[in-house]
Amino acid sequence: MNAKSANDSGSFFRRAIFAALLISIFILHTVFSFDGLTSRTGIDQAQVAREVARGNGLTTQFVRPVALQQLVENEKEINLQQIPETYHSPLNILVYAGVLKMVGADNFENHKMEVNDKIYKLDRIIAITCATFFLTAIGINYLLISRIFDAKIASTVALIMIFSEYMWKITQAGLPQMLMLTLFSAAAYLAWRAVEAQEAERKPLVPALLSGFFFGLLALSHWMTLWIFIGYFIFACFYFRPRGVIAVGLAAIMLLFIAGPVIFNWTQTGEAKGTAFHAIHGAGGAADSAMRQVDSPDFNVKGLLARTAQSTLLQISNVHNYLGGLILAPAFFLCLAHPFKRSSIAIFRWNILIMWIFASIGMGIYGLTESQLEPNQLHLLFAPLMCGYGVALISIIWSRCPLSQQSGALGNLHIAIILLITAAPLLLHIKQLSENRRALTSIDGVHAYSLNGLLNKVTDPEDIIVSDQPWAVAWYADRHAIWIPQSYGDFTKIEAIAEKSSPIAGIHISSMSYRGDDIRTSLYRNRDMAALAYLPWITYFTRNEAAANISQNPSVAPLIDPQVGRYPHRASLSGLFEPSAYYSRTKIRVKN
């Protein structure tokens, strides 16, 4: 009885320590080390979610020129105040909308920034939502890995996830990846139950079809995850018995899930694929260029093949980083050669591998960048499961070492070393925070207060703004913004389209147009608008002496020249090393 009480006390003590650690790291990354949302995709989804919370449906204040082109080509009515959102998958947006509605974010005035505010309050709400999904995913993966292996391996993986700086950076970005991780983990858990049932000669139908339900939700979180489902579908075709029955059921479930968005896109824009298809032009600058064109972008097969090859090589060379930095996750590939005693463990690893291969193919086609906040990154969904297999392999090797027979910490030395290596970046991060804690005023060229406090005051709610960071203008300033095109010709076409409903009120330019780029890259990305992009910077550092000359540029002068420009009135929004400015069609008046 005493031994049992001691075990219960020890178990309670360990759980209490784990809970305290979890809460502490949660607070660290959502309060003390949080400086605002760091991904434009996360910011974009948040602004769409606010429109949903307001009862405006799936509409966006961030207008892509290619979306206007789709509406024109299909003879759809264009209302710049009600542009349908056809780029993002809807589920994460709907989740954000529910959260924003609960905190009263549908009313912009409820959460306006003050002069001394460093962080937009709603940014933190979005980050907390993402972090909550991350904690949920940790719990699901604990249940899954403890069922595949044991509680010790599951606990190790859970701690590795908690200590992963990469995972926490994703939560701070506002990306849908944490919701995706939760749904994928739930789908994988049910897929494992189906494999278990079949290996035990029971019927796998119910858990297999339930896994299809979660894969459907996953597809509604990010269209790229359809590639993962293709891998699972192929596995189901050849493994589950009776062959083909479960696979057909899975396909039917997926079709039901994606039918709604496809019908929505078709009815709203005349194209079932929406604007999301144009992401196939490649990650980063290529896809951005396609989105900023009024005319349909040319589809280059040779370019697609070249980008796919380049992206595949990038994935191979950066697989550890893409797997969330979870130590031992890449060891999963060594597990493919290990003869596991339980057939279910051996079979399930092939399911993971097939899904991962097809996910990699999809990422190769649509492209990845080396950025840690790449929105098309799907590798991290597999990281906990792969890490579980990796820890299991290390544990098997360790069991053959004499030290493993020792009791206490010495017998678990391999686990301690793994956790120490994983926690090192987190400990370093905490040390840096304690030495120099300073909230950033700008994240990748987005100065929240200049938009929320200043641009909002010099514009009206019905104004249409052309901007180089329209996602940020939509979220922080609560204004409709069109992504600035690369050519002056496209700009005039957009003006002509806008004249029919809501004329363009002004142009917002920030350091986003050149920040982090060398001048050649910046010139390529901005083309005719390059002079306009650099004008605030040159104006600030030359005290306007050279600005007068550059404004004579044939692409810039008709827009902002004080005498002949269509947007001659200027308001400076931010200065120092990242200046931004707003050029208005009418005389600027600051509202209270």
Regions found by a protein language model. Give the residues of each.
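Signature aromatic-anchored transmembrane alpha helix within multi-pass, membrane-resident enzymes
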Residues: 11-22, 159, 205-213, 229-234, ...
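Membrane-embedded, lumen/periplasm-facing catalytic core of multi-pass transferases
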Residues: 33, 409-468, 472, 505-511
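Transmembrane alpha-helix segments characteristic
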Residues: 16, 21-22, 156, 161, ...
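Hydrophobic, aromatic-rich transmembrane alpha-helices
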Residues: 141, 234-237, 311-350, 356, ...
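Hydrophobic/aromatic-rich transmembrane helices and adjacent perimembrane loops
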Residues: 171, 176-180, 185, 218, ...
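Transmembrane-helix signature of polytopic, membrane-embedded enzymes
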Residues: 107-123, 136-163, 181-182, 202, ...
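Membrane-interface helix-loop-helix junctions at transmembrane boundaries of multi-pass membrane enzymes
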Residues: 147, 198-205, 239-250, 333-357, ...
